[in-house]
Design a protein with these regions (language model features):
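N-terminal redox-cofactor-binding region of secreted/periplasmic oxidoreductases
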Residues: 1-518
Length: 518
């Protein structure tokens, strides 16, 4: 059977695409997923269902690709969690439903992607959500994804303290972090009503499963896209040790920021010299495949907590965050600070000390990493390096964020909560150089991988897809996931990725929609 559309990867984008494209009964859709599928809530494991647990991120979890990557020159390779299940990373994430900033999308448009300015993407953000707290022109009321913020009287002690401390330092209160002029400290919008992690498998795909024109296949590894000349015609897949070919009129890669560029390179689309060196026949040279790897570096300031302070987190995932603009920065809200308990029986993260950490995320880093093929074997992961904090401006902003955390901890709101600082030590704080060394040794990462198949016009030599997700130089092949974001957003990327999938699905489905499908 030849499908009209094959979607590779049932993650946050893939589930949306499959659900939307199959709304047309004349369009046959095959959704492929390497991980397991749980088609109803009753069979969904608790590690995926409940937002208070991060067990599915563990390296030994069957729902995690459990990749390893390089983060800085002073650290050993780190574990990188990526969802391997229908629902993708949205099925194992922290349930933050925070949009990119207005300026993020205006930058996309300025870089030659004029269909992605803020006014053009706002309707898709609105249509995909039902905001349970705010009713205005910037928020939706009839979408499939519930969005809510925890009311102040329900905030746990350590979350409320961050809010009070930030206000004491003069930062404004931010009642709506998804508003166009947001900034300051407030409750983060979440997509976990009653503590349930609402991935797009639940919000989009499940309601479409009954359609006869939609086929969902789990535990299927995509090995490569097959091309006839420079036209995609199918996907080579593997299941149960056997290799098969499935044919499609259009192939869409939605395998994520690491797996989509990996599949492109295995398919002969990418840096020509590198592919030839691996013995892969070249379909089309695109030097940007795997480059421009963007994410959010995170530094953690840890503090010991007094006896009697409740460190059991709210099982509904309450989160308070401070977003601000670093000194001398021209990019608004380029730092985010959050706080949470490290000691957490609910999440399975139990340490002997009573500890909390302030997490400082660099939301718009200047530096970028890259991804390369390590093997032609599709079972072997690609090699990737975040190259965090190699840029002086990135280090400068992170130093400032760490020092701000120390000032927050000194405020009255924390007097009855904290007893002592654990890290960084006084020695780590003795100078800029010492703090830089500590940061390079300890910095962590978010799971917001972006940019490795970035969108842009054909005149951009590093662009991999055009603004409609179509791979430059290869017919009937698209990439639709976080990898096509030109830069990481100044927010968790989950909401933006869903918006991107909704928008491109509409283009594909429309009669004038830049596709072989009409």
């Amino acid at each position: 059977m030849k499908y009209d559309v094959i979607v590779v990867g049932a993650g946050s984008a893939g589930c949306v695409l499959a659900a939307r494209l199959s709304e047309d009964p004349g369009c046959s859709v095959l959704l492929l997923e390497a991980g397991a599928d749980y088609p109803d809530m009753q069979g969904l494991p608790g590690a995926l269902q409940y937002g208070h647990t991060r067990a599915a991120e563990a390296q030994d979890s069957p729902h995690n690709w459990a990749l390893t990557g390089t983060i800085t020159r002073l650290q050993k390779p780190i574990h990188v969690a990526q969802g391997k299940v229908v629902g993708g990373s949205g099925a194992i994430n922290g349930q933050v439903m925070l949009r990119g900033l207005l300026e993020d999308f205006e930058s996309w448009a300025a870089w030659g992607n004029d269909a992605w300015g803020y006014r053009k993407v706002l309707p898709y953000f609105r249509n995909m959500e039902t905001d349970l707290d705010i009713r205005d022109d910037f928020h939706g009321a009839n979408g499939p994804i519930p969005v809510l913020r925890r009311q102040q009287e329900l905030w746990p002690t350590i979350q409320a303290a961050l809010h009070q401390a930030a206000l004491a330092l003069g930062f404004p209160a931010d009642p709506d972090m998804n508003g166009p002029e947001s900034g300051g400290v407030g409750a983060i919008p979440m997509n976990n009503p009653d503590g349930i992690r609402m991935s797009t498998a639940l919000t989009h795909l499940n309601a479409a499963r009954h359609r006869l024109n939609l086929t969902v296949k789990s535990n299927i590894l995509a090995r490569r896209v097959l091309c006839d000349g420079q036209r995609a015609v199918g996907v080579e897949v593997e299941s149960g040790g056997e290799v098969f070919v499935v044919e499609g009129a259009e192939i869409i890669l939605s395998a994520g920021g690491l797996k989509s560029p990996h599949l492109l390179m295995l398919s002969g689309v990418g840096p020509a010299q590198a592919l030839r060196g691996m013995g892969i026949p070249l379909v089309h040279p695109l030097p940007g495949v795997g480059q421009n790897l963007r994410n959010h570096p995170i530094a953690s300031v840890s503090m010991r907590v007094k006896e009697g302070v409740d460190l059991i987190p709210d099982n509904r995932g309450t989160r308070i965050a401070l977003r601000y603009t670093a000194s001398g920065s021209s990019t608004r809200n380029d730092i985010m600070i959050m706080t949470n308990a490290i000691y957490s029986p609910l999440s399975g993260d139990v340490l002997p000390e009573r500890t909390i950490r302030f997490s400082c995320a660099l939301e718009l880093p200047t530096g970028a990493g890259e991804l390369h093929l390590a093997s032609t074997d599709p079972h072997e992961q690609p090699s990737f390096n975040y190259r965090y904090l190699e840029d002086l401006w990135d280090r400068q902003r992170m130093r400032e964020a760490v020092r701000l955390c120390l000032r927050l901890a000194e405020q009255q709101a924390y007097r009855d909560i904290l007893t002592a600082r654990i890290a960084p030590t006084d020695q780590d704080l003795a100078s800029d150089d010492a703090l830089d060394t500590w940061l390079l040794k300890t910095v962590g990462t978010a799971r917001h991988i972006s940019g490795t198949c970035k969108m842009g016009p054909a005149s951009d030599p590093m662009a991999v897809v055009d603004q409609y997700g179509r791979v430059h130089g290869v017919e009937n092949l698209r990439v639709v996931d976080g990898s096509i974001l030109p830069h990481v957003t100044r927010a968790n990327t989950h909401a933006t990725i869903i918006m991107v999938a909704e928008r491109i699905a509409e283009w594909i489905s429309s009669a004038s929609g830049h596709s072989a499908i009409a």
